[in-house]
Amino acid sequence: MNTDDGVCLTLQLDIASSEPPAPGSFQHAVLVGKLAFFTALGIPDNDIFGTPIRDFIPRNFKGKASKDAWSSCGSCHNDGLSDGVTWIFATGPRRTIPSDGTFSKQNPQDLRLLNWSAIRDSITDFNNNSRAVQFGCGFASDNFDPGQCFAKGNTTLANPAIYDHGILQGGSDALDAQTLWAFAAVRPLHQPQPADTTAGQAVFAANCASCHGGPKWTKSQIFYRDNPAAVAENGATLDPGVTRLAPAPPVAATPANEFFSFTCNNLTIKYLEDVGTFDISDPLEIRDNAAASTAFGRNGFNVPSLLDINYHSPYLHRGQAQTLEAVFPLHGLGPGGSGFPPTTTIATQLTAQQQADLLVFLKSIDGTTPHFRSEGDDFRDAVRAQGTCPMPPPS
């Protein structure tokens, strides 16, 4: 743009520092997903993959990601990882979970259940955060013009296909792009590598790998019939093998959307594990939406990924442990490892040397570390060998 104030001629140019990916390319779709993840304003829901990245004007779609542009997915998940903060949600106090362990980076069909209480199983489900937490109208609301989103926020009608344990993809191009970005672009940080982790690996293999093995460093994986997995919010599951629990009293009976386990014939994998870290009497274990209503946790917690664990302090579902060393006396292990407080823990079951060796190995885990087999791997292979029930995703 040229401007002339009578004194001098000013020339304004938009000079690209690099050529962005071409519309229609894989790299462009990933970049659009990044924009959708980090904008607190919004982008169009659909017909976005042919639009040059510089042609998106998020302020024209304010009110979609959040009301008054106060928050985005990236506000808590910086770089797609974690801010380390414990927030009070509808399920209770929850430390932000990093997204680097959501997918196996070798297999986009290897997806863990999501949230500490396994109440979701797709990035698409988190459109409900844009609406119910950030008070925007979300990224599946093309039936409303951007002005309505800004004015009405989450009072606009929700897309009926998007709910916890609803569709994995197909809600909108913007949500599918977010999913693509989480798989293709979010990566664990490289950790300092000690000279020798052999001793710690042996301790890990014997005591931790069954839950924290696998390419995502968690056994949590969707094996049940999905997309959607349930007929409606809090509705019946579409796969009879899913055991779905309501939170234990005194928690309100709904939402009853914790996916506790999946059974195929005589084989069962648990998603929620009780490791003795939920104290129902603690006044911090409250939910954000119901007075005197206790948080989820009595049934256990969805096994977290240990990818990059050295970087993601504090630890446990509400950040009770500031360091990995502090986890050991709190985390149940062995015959008395469930219930609060656990009578046997990592600290009581392992010698001081074993704990030191384990700590060295845990701090080294990153995307380059060879993983161990988990219960999830064993379950998948056993179901395949039977040749019954819905076949698990390819490994």
Locate the predicted segments by residue.
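Periplasmic c-type cytochrome electron-transfer domains
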Residues: M1-S395
